[in-house]
């Protein structure tokens, strides 16, 4: 062994060692004399007696090696058998239970490298003696410590095997050499016959199941009952058999490996997979998908689309008025085709889309929705009392009657019946501006007026696209009469050109008729008609019949009457400039 830079001191060590050996031979060197030697002398004598760097030994069938480290300091490495219960334990476990310094690669290492351990290397380098409280670990001391650790290994292994033997009794001695360990039968029989090692290979399936299956409530299990239970579990599903493969290792060691993975794997993946993915998928995706997507879709969608051509056949481009639907649509939409009527929309529309969803078209759409429930309508009696509900009476009218030849009174009755269908329970009144029998009347237009239960006034008056202030006025009077002048201000600003042209006419018209015709109009308005709601649809009505806002509003508040003018223009409203300024502010 080479000592690097310490070759100069080797001669001195050798001389000292020879003198110590000479004295020991003359004084019959013993243990009591060894204790009197210094640590330096003990290290030199130990190194002379054991000049080799390594010494291999075997105890209880376990091999260990005593080697030199740190220049004349001894250590030991113990090989742990692979089948030992603590083979893969962490290093901390060996430090706590075996007193080892470290554990790595299946070797227990014991080395005294703490500050209290004597080191010849430190003393040689420093030139000063080691601490007096330090102790030197000799070759025999480290060997005894290795033997103690091996005995503890055998003790823990025996305790583990005794727990196994308590369940199944004693068996033959375990031959560790069959599993690749360094144990031998000779060493086991000679050195550790008092240890009960067992042969796992001869125990069979009982021992393997015991090693891998935990106990339940401290009760031992019957092997025959376990076999029956396992046989029943094999007929179950794959998910139930999976934990049994994890806990029981019969297929790994015993002779049952062939039936477990050979014949029994066939029903798991062969016969059971066929009904799962073979036969069951056919009714799920094959036969059941046909009635779901093919047979059911035919009556649902074909009946709806087949009925549409029948609906269109009665309303061809000829427009022969063969049904009440065509007749009423033509009357209410100002001779427009039924196909030009927009679809039903909500009545909660703003002022910006009045031209698209006007009031008569809304009534027309409502009639469109309920026309399917109308019975053949013929001649009906007209109620003289406008407050009574209109009850249509079917008369003898042929299906092929030409409704275009009907008179205005008959058309009026038909419209009344249709409006009664649209608004059941409402008061249906047919109001005529002017006398129908008087040819000199100012207007012969007739309107259907519907008073709903909530007080909403609905009329089927047809007006031109330019007359768009009627719907605007109706919304303001039905919602809030006080907001009419404010919104009228915005409407007048949007029509500056029309308002500027008629500004002179407006003041003259307001001044002349506000004082001359107010009392007459108020008197006529109070006695001429007993209806709760007045509808003035025609723009040809003279301005004498239009009262001022203050007096009419007072009258309306007292008699609960709302006046709606569908042809209201910004220049036709009668108000004072002071009132207009107050509202605009």
Curated annotation (Swiss-Prot):
Chain intervals with Low complexity compositional bias: 232-241
Extent of Polar residues compositional bias: 209-223, 379-405, 479-488
Composition bias, Basic residues: 507-525
Domain of life according to the entry: Viruses
Biased composition (Basic and acidic residues): 490-506
Region (Disordered): 209-244, 377-405, 473-542
Record protein name field: Uncharacterized protein L397
UniProt organism field: Acanthamoeba polyphaga mimivirus
